[in-house]
Amino acid sequence: MSDFTKFLTTAPVAFILFSSFVFALFIEINRFFPDILTF
């Protein structure tokens, strides 16, 4: 049961870190290469 509670505490933290990294990457790509849908 301790492994399950450890998963419940680490999974949201890992998801928040990963999603914030991906969102920041998308923002930086759109900052340097705007209108990427027109290529």
UniProtKB/Swiss-Prot annotation:
The keyword Thylakoid applies. Pfam families: PSI_PsaJ (PF01701). GO terms for biological process: photosynthesis. It is a single-pass membrane protein. Keywords: Membrane, Photosynthesis, Photosystem I, Thylakoid, Transmembrane, Transmembrane helix. It comes from the Bacteria. Disulfide bonds: none annotated. The chain crosses the membrane at residues 7-27. It is found in: Cellular thylakoid membrane. GO terms for cellular component: photosystem I; plasma membrane-derived thylakoid membrane. May help in the organization of the PsaE and PsaF subunits. Belongs to the PsaJ family. This is Photosystem I reaction center subunit IX. It comes from Synechococcus sp. (strain JA-3-3Ab). The gene is psaJ.
